[in-house]
Amino acid sequence: MKFVSWNVNGLRACVGKGFEEIFKSLDADFFCLQETKLQPHQITLDTPGYHQFWCSAEKKGYSGTAIFARREPLSVTYGIGIPELDTEGRLITLEYENFYLVTCYTPNSQQELARLPHRLTWDEAFRNYLSALDKSK
């Protein structure tokens, strides 16, 4: 299996710079994107043969993740399961028979560590989330 993970820093701008051609040329089984900065209805991508999964931030034009998967998953989870951490579209989990695929856009602590408490809360919750997934497969 071939996995690709790419922080696109704004998918609309990336599409204007040849994203679809790159996507097709990489021929990945799973293509994970971080920092999409859009709502799924704001873009149409030509990705035949892929299932698309989007997790967008409530705040428009901010963060967001997506996964394009050739194989349909058994289940899909959006977010980490903690409401105060799940408004920024930072995590998608696809479940398959023998594994989970998780794409994550981790929060930045920002200038002068303004969001450090949020980041530390996220880091602990993410570790716990991954640990729980690990125990289930």
Go through each PLM region and give its residues.
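N-terminal, active-site-proximal structural segment of metallo-dependent hydrolase catalytic domains
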Residues: 1-46, 57, 62, 78
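Glycosyltransferase catalytic domains, chiefly GT-A lineage
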Residues: 5, 18-21, 27-30, 81, ...
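Structured helix-beta-strand junction loops
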Residues: 26, 71, 97, 136-137
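Structured beta-strand-rich core segments of catalytic domains in phosphoester-bond hydrolases
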Residues: 37, 42-114
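A long, amphipathic alpha-helix that forms part
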Residues: 116-137
